[in-house]
Amino acid sequence: MATARRRKIVAGNWKMNKSVPEALALVRDLRGQVASLGDTVEVVVAPPFVALQPLHVALEGAPLALAAQNCHWESSGAFTGEISAPMLAELGCAYVIVGHSERRQLFGDTDEQVNKRAKAVRAAGMTPIICVGETLAEREANQTLAVVERQVRGALEGFGAKEVAGFVLAYEPVWAIGTGRNATAAQAQEVHAAIRGLVERLYDGETAGRVRIQYGGSVKPDNAAELLGQPDVDGALVGGASLKAGDFAAIVKAAT
């Protein structure tokens, strides 16, 4: 497999948290804490939809990229309550999270729908952060790698090597999200290496060497350095800890 120096990417998924004033205060604080890092780590924040436009304005010139937490696969139409990828691009989003376990578990997102969302994101000129991961029952049944492979294959269906090389994949074991439990560094590395190996089989070594794979699942300041120190862990998708500027900044610094 071709080797590549991959720039770490740390993204904060705020989920359904923070009012617009709270969101503005958080990024103002965060901006000050990560400014000294320069461009060594790519930092991304994914606030609720209502905060995207205000944050786009507030983040002008800042070393912080904006992400949305989901999108519909159609560009427009009679889809009450949905938001399209082109709309998100207009708001300054560089990334869109697709396939998050909460979307799969709570809203029934399928591998096919994740693929359609990813294609819409790409068509709108943004980069998908494609989430995959197993439940506790699947891990205990030794199905982790099979489940993750199915999800990765489904999400990448129809994409070419050059596109995939620029994507971000995120391994987030469902049993570790919001539970306080997290995969060990060795467990994370095993799955990340398997994902990279799958990308090599599906495409080629260069693509596998360039695609970035984040770990998500109870990432905190006290475990970030060990997780991010693994050779195939290229960053973190952070939930609860991203709601506190100090905690999130500490995770970002652990990625340097």
Swiss-Prot record:
| Main subcellular localisation | cytoplasm
Record: active site = H100 (electrophile), E172 (proton acceptor)
Q: Which GO terms describe its molecular function?
A: triose-phosphate isomerase activity
- Pfam families on file: TIM
SS bonds (residue pairs): none
The catalysed reaction is: D-glyceraldehyde 3-phosphate = dihydroxyacetone phosphate
Q: Which SUPFAM superfamilies match?
A: Triosephosphate isomerase (TIM) (SSF51351)
What function does this protein fulfil? Answer: Involved in the gluconeogenesis. Catalyzes stereospecifically the conversion of dihydroxyacetone phosphate (DHAP) to D-glyceraldehyde-3-phosphate (G3P).
Give the matching HAMAP family: TIM_B (MF_00147_B)
The molecule here is called Triosephosphate isomerase
Q: Which organism is it from?
A: Myxococcus xanthus (strain DK1622)
Taxonomic lineage per UniProt?
A: Bacteria, Pseudomonadati, Myxococcota, Myxococcia, Myxococcales
